[in-house]
């Protein structure tokens, strides 16, 4: 039986976070009434000329520097010719032979798959290029009975199309890459990453070939995948479809396909064009884009610390594990919250801060369906909770209750933890004399558990600890309870 190898390359369109469009001054704001953000340039009225948006170029430079690519000192805009109702000019301004960003790579972390018996691993994906281009408009097929409306608000919106080499070998790798790229463009501030609004969408080029064969199989391109789940499902379906087709004696044709999320399958859209079908030629209305070394140096000086560098710094500076550092730098907002938390709680509490951020805080964020930048508990408020754990004022269990109270109250005061501790009488009982008296009562009331422990049953000891904590309503210092019980039980 033939063993098949999957070959995947991704083309990702990241909408650049400029206020105006790439070749006009019209707004890029999402959600406006149709055709209210389309100026004469976007409408392709006679006599208009495009003017390149400097901000779009700087965002492309920033991306190129972040992935270790070559930023071309001279790149050229080209006309990509095709007819579609939402493309008023009859061509799209893009880059073809000389893109602004050339090469580069992104390291991805592919998670373990227990069902398939695969362990987690890292992989470096090489990029072919990233080029600037304008978006087309939007066809409104469902708004008019028997007709199609055209909304040109999106026409001319700046895009950075990021193209990988065909190096990914599974849907899991493709999704890991897409997530890494999504996180990076948001970290750099060049794209808002809103997949529902179409700010970040992927086209997947998928083919299969017998294991060991060098020649690529015929590829199908799946267009406009705007969620990671859709990307994974579409690739998995397409791989199965191609293998079944070949094994049944058929041939895969080069075509563009669409993914139907309701049926969880791909369907044919049109035959896939080659580059020569678009009749690319340099745009005579635009000068070559010249990027000097001084411009690159200035953009580099304004770059934020990159995730990989920050991850390594967290390991060295705060003593957290590589895994924890990876989670803490998963988004820029998460990393900033962690650093603010440690700054307030003290470096000695860095590991405690990391555990809380990845545990209780993340759990509450998931419960409410919000991101860390919308967290109702500020870093200063949480830092005080952690300090009260560290100085023995409260137990970890009580701290969780206080945290949830601050969260639900949406308290504004930085000293909320101390206020709640005082108001509810939540201070941990650390007085040895008081604890000894409580433990004596627990031992007297639980003679059977005492006998079982002395007979070698360790579970009985845990039962006694539980009874002591219950007697103090969770306010006892657990460590002291353990020590005193061991002392009294001999």
UniProtKB/Swiss-Prot annotation:
Fetch the Pfam families from UniProt: GatB_N (PF02934), GatB_Yqey (PF02637)
> What InterPro entries does the annotation carry?
Asn/Gln-tRNA_amidoTrfase_suB/E, Asn/Gln-tRNA_Trfase_suB/E_cat, Asn/Gln_amidotransferase, Asn/Gln_tRNA_amidoTrase-B-like, GatB, GatB_C_1, GatB_Yqey_C_2, Gln-tRNA_amidoTrfase_suB_CS
**Does the entry feature the keyword Ligase, yes or no?**
yes
Q: Give all cystine bridges in this chain.
A: none
Q: Which residues form a coiled coil?
A: none
| Reactions listed under catalytic activity | L-glutamyl-tRNA(Gln) + L-glutamine + ATP + H2O = L-glutaminyl-tRNA(Gln) + L-glutamate + ADP + phosphate + H(+); L-aspartyl-tRNA(Asn) + L-glutamine + ATP + H2O = L-asparaginyl-tRNA(Asn) + L-glutamate + ADP + phosphate + 2 H(+)
Enzyme type, top EC level: ligase
Please, one GO biological process term? translation
EC number(s) reported in the record:
6.3.5.-
Question: Can the keyword ATP-binding be found in this entry's annotation?
Answer: yes
Top-level lineage group: Bacteria
- Alphabetical UniProt keywords: ATP-binding, Ligase, Nucleotide-binding, Protein biosynthesis
Which Gene Ontology molecular-function terms are recorded?
A: asparaginyl-tRNA synthase (glutamine-hydrolyzing) activity; ATP binding; glutaminyl-tRNA synthase (glutamine-hydrolyzing) activity
According to the record's subunit comment, the protein's assembly and interactions are: Heterotrimer of A, B and C subunits.
**Family note:** Belongs to the GatB/GatE family. GatB subfamily.
Q: What does this protein do?
A: Allows the formation of correctly charged Asn-tRNA(Asn) or Gln-tRNA(Gln) through the transamidation of misacylated Asp-tRNA(Asn) or Glu-tRNA(Gln) in organisms which lack either or both of asparaginyl-tRNA or glutaminyl-tRNA synthetases. The reaction takes place in the presence of glutamine and ATP through an activated phospho-Asp-tRNA(Asn) or phospho-Glu-tRNA(Gln).
Q: Extract the PANTHER family matched here.
A: GLUTAMYL-TRNA GLN AMIDOTRANSFERASE SUBUNIT B MITOCHONDRIAL AND PROKARYOTIC PET112-RELATED (PTHR11659), GLUTAMYL-TRNA(GLN) AMIDOTRANSFERASE SUBUNIT B, MITOCHONDRIAL (PTHR11659:SF0)
Name of the molecule in the record: Aspartyl/glutamyl-tRNA(Asn/Gln) amidotransferase subunit B
Q: Which organism is it from?
A: Burkholderia pseudomallei (strain K96243)
């Amino acid at each position: 039986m033939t063993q098949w190898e999957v070959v995947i390359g991704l083309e990702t369109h990241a909408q650049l976070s400029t206020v105006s469009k790439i070749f006009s001054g019209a707004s890029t704001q999402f959600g406006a009434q149709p055709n209210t953000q389309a100026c004469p340039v976007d409408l392709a009225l006679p006599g208009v000329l495009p003017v390149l948006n400097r901000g779009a170029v700087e965002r492309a430079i920033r991306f190129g520097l972040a992935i270790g690519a070559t930023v071309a000192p001279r790149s050229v805009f080209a006309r990509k010719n095709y007819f579609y109702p939402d493309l008023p000019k009859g061509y799209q301004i893009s880059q073809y032979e000389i893109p602004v960003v050339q090469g580069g790579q992104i390291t991805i972390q592919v998670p373990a798959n227990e069902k398939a018996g695969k362990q987690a691993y890292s992989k470096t994906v090489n990029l072919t290029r990233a080029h600037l281009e304008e978006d087309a408009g939007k066809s409104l097929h469902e708004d008019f009975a028997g007709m199609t409306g055209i909304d040109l608000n999106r026409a001319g919106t700046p895009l950075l199309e990021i193209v990988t080499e065909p190096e990914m070998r599974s849907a899991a790798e493709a999704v890991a890459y897409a997530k890494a790229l999504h996180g990076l463009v948001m970290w750099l501030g060049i794209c808002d990453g809103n997949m529902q609004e179409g700010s970040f969408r992927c086209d997947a080029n998928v083919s299969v070939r017998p294991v060991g064969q060098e020649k690529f199989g015929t590829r199908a391109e799946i267009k406009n995948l705007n969620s990671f789940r859709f990307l994974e499902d579409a690739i998995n379906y397409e791989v199965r479809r191609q293998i079944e087709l070949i094994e049944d004696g058929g041939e895969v044709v080069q075509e563009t396909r669409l993914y139907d999320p309701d049926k969880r399958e791909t369907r044919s859209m049109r035959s896939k064009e080659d580059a020569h079908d678009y009749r690319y030629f340099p745009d005579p209305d635009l000068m070559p884009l010249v990027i000097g070394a001084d411009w690159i140096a200035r953009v580099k000086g304004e770059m934020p610390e990159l995730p990989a560098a920050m991850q390594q710094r967290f390991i060295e500076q705060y003593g957290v594990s590589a895994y924890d550092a990876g989670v803490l730098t998963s988004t820029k907002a998460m990393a900033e919250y962690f650093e603010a938390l440690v700054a307030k709680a003290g470096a000695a509490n860095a590991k405690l801060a990391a555990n809380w951020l990845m545990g209780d805080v993340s759990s509450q964020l998931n419960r409410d369906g919000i991101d860390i930048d919308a967290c109702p508990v500020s870093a200063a408020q949480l830092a005080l909770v952690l300090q009260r754990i560290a100085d023995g004022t409260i137990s970890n269990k009580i701290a969780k209750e206080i945290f949830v109270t601050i969260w639900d109250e949406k308290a504004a005061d930085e000293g909320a933890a101390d206020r709640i501790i005082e108001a509810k009488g939540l201070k941990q009982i650390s007085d040895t004399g008081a604890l000894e008296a409580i433990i004596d009562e627990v031992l007297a009331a639980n003679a059977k558990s005492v006998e079982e422990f002395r007979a070698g049953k360790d579970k009985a000891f845990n039962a006694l600890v539980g009874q002591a904590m219950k007697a103090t309503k969770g306010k006892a210092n657990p460590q002291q309870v353990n020590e005193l019980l061991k002392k009294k039980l001999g």
